């Protein structure tokens, strides 16, 4: 398991609410919680930047973190991430913030301490561009959307 440096920015984290942890040995994501001052209503179509009370420092340029939606919130309530995916670079050290978007038709109350997103560490490969006049041929070539078949 990889060590991840973390700073607790809200004293409720680790006392009233548990630190992010894996729910099962097979879990890929650590749940992030809404460390709001009070329960907050997210109106249909509204986005809100929600603090997690936590900052992390990955440090290893071969890793990054992604903030992803929780499937139940999206499927059952229409609550997804306003930026779809949050990318946390290895050298970022600020508070983790979650952009929540209510794409549903009814108001949704985000409770203080509610699990609103998940954090997943992913490997990163940095690349540089090698400018060429032509690419080696491939079977697909320049075929774009829908090129590989309809079903």
Curated annotation (Swiss-Prot):
Function: This enzyme is involved in nucleotide metabolism: it produces dUMP, the immediate precursor of thymidine nucleotides and it decreases the intracellular concentration of dUTP so that uracil cannot be incorporated into DNA.
CDD domains for the chain: trimeric_dUTPase (cd07557)
GO molecular-function term, one example from the UniProt record: magnesium ion binding
Entry cofactors: Mg(2+)
EC numbers, comma separated: 3.6.1.23
Pathway this chain belongs to: Pyrimidine metabolism; dUMP biosynthesis; dUMP from dCTP (dUTP route): step 2/2
Enzyme class per UniProt: hydrolase
Keyword entries, A-Z: Hydrolase, Magnesium, Metal-binding, Nucleotide metabolism
Gene responsible for this protein: dut
Biological classification of the source: Bacteria, Pseudomonadati, Pseudomonadota, Gammaproteobacteria, Pseudomonadales
SUPFAM superfamilies: dUTPase-like
Superkingdom in the source lineage: Bacteria
Family as reported in the entry's similarity comment: Belongs to the dUTPase family.
Record's protein name: Deoxyuridine 5'-triphosphate nucleotidohydrolase
PANTHER family in alphabetical order: DEOXYURIDINE 5'-TRIPHOSPHATE NUCLEOTIDOHYDROLASE
Record carries keyword Signal: no
Reaction catalysis annotation: dUTP + H2O = dUMP + diphosphate + H(+)
Any one GO biological process: dUTP catabolic process
Binding site for substrate: 70-72, 83, 87-89, 97
InterPro entries, sorted: dUTPase, dUTPase-like, dUTPase-like_sf, dUTPase_trimeric
Organism: Pseudomonas putida (strain W619)
């Amino acid at each position: 398991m990889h060590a991840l440096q973390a700073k607790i920015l809200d004293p409720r984290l680790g006392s009233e609410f548990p630190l992010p942890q894996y729910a099962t040995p097979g879990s890929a994501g650590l749940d992030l919680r809404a460390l709001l001052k009070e329960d907050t209503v997210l109106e249909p179509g509204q986005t809100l930047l929600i603090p997690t009370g936590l900052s992390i420092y990955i440090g290893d340029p071969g890793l990054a973190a992604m903030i992803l939606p929780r499937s139940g919130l999206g499927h059952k309530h229409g609550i997804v991430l306003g930026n779809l995916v949050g990318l946390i670079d290895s050298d970022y050290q600020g508070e983790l913030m979650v952009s929540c978007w209510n794409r549903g038709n009814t108001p949704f109350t985000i409770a203080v301490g509610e699990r609103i997103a998940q954090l997943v560490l992913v490997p990163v490969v940095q690349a540089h561009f090698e400018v060429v006049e032509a690419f080696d041929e491939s079977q697909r070539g320049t075929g774009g959307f829908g090129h590989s078949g309809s079903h």
